[in-house]
Curated annotation (Swiss-Prot):
Subcellular location as annotated: Cytoplasm
Protein name: ATP phosphoribosyltransferase
Any one Gene Ontology cellular component term annotated for this protein: cytoplasm
GO MF annotation terms: ATP binding; ATP phosphoribosyltransferase activity; magnesium ion binding
A Pfam family that the UniProt record links to this protein: HisG_C
Originating species: Salmonella schwarzengrund (strain CVM19633)
EC number of this enzyme: 2.4.2.17
PROSITE patterns xref list: ATP_P_PHORIBOSYLTR
Amino acid sequence: MLDNTRLRIAIQKSGRLSDDSRELLARCGIKINLHTQRLIAMAENMPIDILRVRDDDIPGLVMDGVVDLGIIGENVLEEELLNRRAQGEDPRYFTLRRLDFGGCRLSLATPVDEAWDGPAALDGKRIATSYPHLLKRYLDQKGVSFKSCLLNGSVEVAPRAGLADAICDLVSTGATLEANGLREVEVIYRSKACLIQRDGEMAQSKQELIDKLLTRIQGVIQARESKYIMMHAPSERLEEVIALLPGAERPTILPLAGEQQRVAMHMVSSETLFWETMEKLKALGASSILVLPIEKMME
């Protein structure tokens, strides 16, 4: 029996978002011992329970108030939302923030030897998918009628097996489509992981813990998107150096022992520092350029 005084977070047990969700919670300082077969894990240092479930169960658990928070792909969340609305329900939840992992796209794909002149080419065709509601919404907007073939896995084999004329499935690299003689022809939905919260009254202690967790998640994401940069630079060219690092805060300037014309610069940059930028910095006279990852960050 779950303790209602503890914050309950649902994450994917295994699959595309599982490892990233676990890593995010760990980097937020939540100590969890996740055994392979254990579906509920208790945090050692916070009043938090982690429920490891199928990804398509997570939206319902949040909408039904069984758990307080869920980490889920926007594609799965939107599909469940459309499904419940189609059944006359009014699902409630809050999206707290989009996360920086789990990026994918839901796309239409057809056999490589078939011509494509837009969604109208699918009129009257049978389309295999695990996302019937997202597919219907998109093709309804295009005025295209179709027959749905619902599959919960191996969608890409449907055309070769004679089950469908085309598919609508998640795509990351496109390699699986190519291996099955298909080509991506239209993106209908772009998705990332997100953190959602149940609707309804929340105990003050739980809400305070959620707010703390959100602050830490923001710090983790900022740290992943930022770099700590150190270099030596000519004193007279500091503004030119700073201009090459858009998104950087004003740097810390430190004197160099025995140097009058050069200083040490330390800064946090929210921009990716490419080799080309480093070469331009060097051309301005910068040296000893170090670009370091940031583990934690709080503004």
